Amino acid sequence: MARREEETKEFEERVVTINRVAKVVKGGRRFRFTALVVVGDKNGRVGFGTGKAQEVPEAIKKAVEAAKKDLVVVPRVEGTTPHTITGRYGSGSVFMKPAAPGTGVIAGGPVRAVLELAGITDILSKSLGSNTPINMVRATIDGLQNLKNAEDVAKLRGKTVEE
């Protein structure tokens, strides 16, 4: 039990959207709630999850559990990204550009949640195409997954960082 309590304190969670969905049946409509949640430790690990349930708190709980199972490690350089990158998912794309210290996180709603919980403090971003929250979150995480730091690139090329 103690281990599980430590896990919950390790991550910060942020609810991006809650949506009420309806199933039409013979007797009327049956409502359920979907939740999109982003979790991160503000130290380079971030993930997202979705949950669906009859009640909002239960949907959020399911989404948090799903998010913790799907964490991504984000390389950072002095609080920003190592290089410019565009993440894509479906018809949505998110352009992310490193920024000077003190700039802050310049990003729209769902993208901001992912970047802040990943521990990025200075970045410029622009959302293009589809602006559905789930697509924006997935596009942002796609971009963050494709980031490479200088050491990785040097190793791939068989050189040292100084070269």
Curated annotation (Swiss-Prot):
S5 DRBM domain ranges (all copies): 11-74
InterPro entries, per the entry: Ribosomal_Su5_D2-typ_SF, Ribosomal_uS5, Ribosomal_uS5_bac-type, Ribosomal_uS5_C, Ribosomal_uS5_N, Ribosomal_uS5_N_CS, Ribsml_uS5_D2-typ_fold_subgr
Gene3D superfamilies: 3.30.160.20, 3.30.230.10
Example GO molecular function: rRNA binding
The UniProt record lists the keyword rRNA-binding: yes
Keyword Acetylation appears in the UniProt entry: no
GO CC, alphabetical: small ribosomal subunit
Quaternary context: Part of the 30S ribosomal subunit. Contacts proteins S4 and S8.
Domain notes: The N-terminal domain interacts with the head of the 30S subunit; the C-terminal domain interacts with the body and contacts protein S4. The interaction surface between S4 and S5 is involved in control of translational fidelity.
HAMAP family, per database record: Ribosomal_uS5_B (MF_01307_B)
Assigned keywords, A-Z: Ribonucleoprotein, Ribosomal protein, RNA-binding, rRNA-binding
Protein name: Small ribosomal subunit protein uS5
Function: With S4 and S12 plays an important role in translational accuracy.
Entry superkingdom: Bacteria
GO biological process: translation
PANTHER family: MITOCHONDRIAL RIBOSOMAL PROTEIN S5
Family per record: Belongs to the universal ribosomal protein uS5 family.
